[in-house]
Structures are given as structure tokens and as C-alpha cells.
């Protein structure tokens, strides 16, 4: 079995050697018995209270750098001297849809981090559907901005990986191969697009972490994670990676048959917070879902954060300002809040 901490090279455009591939797979499919608790309690200090900021942004032409930087100040986010890693949600090629995190939000986050004194800002994604990363970048409009601003982009599907022990055990995985570029950063920001999801109910800060694990190891669209359970994998990834912040693109979200075939739905805000379950629970309530019914959120509230409104301090705008009854596919109707 591949020992935790070993770095395996997966250069872009090539495959793992058979030996390294089998070693990584051996770690990935380990079926060791669950420990006493599903979380490594030593790795977590659950917050007593959490702050979630909803910042109005009527369109993508708004000054998103200023909006996000204001969020940093209101929430006490400090990136000074940090190596910041931004992980947007990039799925399909079609620009102008509600599938991807909008390039303007990514650009705004880069500018806000630089204004906050970040030592370096890197952007990375490991798309599960489309493997031509250069075309994906150019077609989404992000390539030109990154080139002009000299921001490095990392294809996480083919980055070198380091096998890390998981910090929760909802799946049978006891180790996860994570990109070295992500691990070398010291401030990780997940940047999802708020969407419904036909399997997970919704995709937001936590589900976005599926794009961190390399397709060169876990397949497309990250099949080895799906096989072990979508909800369970969301929890294990969040517990193990532990991002420092989330910036949610909810300026235009997606309802219906998300995360790809749904319809755009303008909401007009950016959500920011360091407690991922709290941010996801807040976004769920905005679109009319009950966080207690979204399967991965109640377990997450045990160690990773808060989902109870009594423990969440809302900053900037009230969620009621953006509250919307999202269209859902029939299999997700049971997730609705009873009062909407």
C-alpha cells in the first residue's frame, strides 16, 4: 500500500506508471474497519458560532473585487503574506451559462487577495467532465485574464499528488491523493457556483471539492468517489482538505436539473464565510432547501461547522432579501423547506 506522505508524479498529458497507479488504488480502496467515530476528533475544533456574509451584486459587471474585499474586512479574513489557492467550479465549455463559477468572480477574488497582501495567488481546477483544460479556460473567458495578470493556473487532474490520511471515515477511503500545488498553499479558498445537483441535492462550497482530486487517479467524473457515495465523499474531502474560506458565486445560480442541465436563476449575491457547512446551509435556505434534509449537512455539523441558524451570525444582507423558491427535479422535492 502507498504510504501517506509519498509524492507521486502525474505530469500533464501522461499516465501514472502501472506500479504507482496500483499503489494509489490500493490506498484508495482500502476497506479497513471504521474507527470509533466517523471523524478524527483531534483534527477539529468545532466553532461555537459562525459568520456568513451575503453581499449584494446585481450583475457580473459590479465591482466584485471591492465587494469581496469588503467581505474580507467584515469577516476578518487575513490573507497577508499567504500563498492563496483559489478553486473555482469549471465544468463545461459554454460561456454565458450558469454552469461555471463566473470568470468575473474569480478575477474579483484574485484582485481582493492581492489587495489584502497575499504573497501569491494560484488558481486550480480538476474538471470532471471536460479534459481539455486549455480550451476550457479560453472558452470560459478566464484564460486571457490569468495571462494578463500573470496568475498561474494548475490542472489538478494532472498535478503531482501526495497521499494524505483522511480525517473522517464516511467512505472506505483511508487515504486521499491530493495535488501538491494545493498542499503547498497555506490559504485555500473554494469558489463554487450555487446550483441544484441531481445527486447531492445542491452543490456549493463542500461539493465543489470533488474538483480537487485528480482524474488521473480517481477517473472521470471522479468515479471512484461516486462509487463510494457522493454524500460520504463530500464529507471526507471537506474534513481532510479543510479549506480556509469559501466565496460562492450566487449572482446567477442554477435551478432545476443541475449541475449541468438546469436553468439560470438570478439571485444577486456573493456568499463568503470560513465555515463551509454554515455557508452551504445559508445558501440552501435561500433557495428553499432545508439544510437538515440535505444528507451531508447534518453530519458535517457534528465537527466541521454549524447549520443551525441560532449559531450563525448573518453579515451584510439578510438571507430573506434573496429568498427564492427554486425549481427542483421530482427526486429532490423532499428537500424543500416546509414553509416555502
Spans of model-derived segments:
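N-terminal and secondary-structure boundary signal
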Residues: 2-340
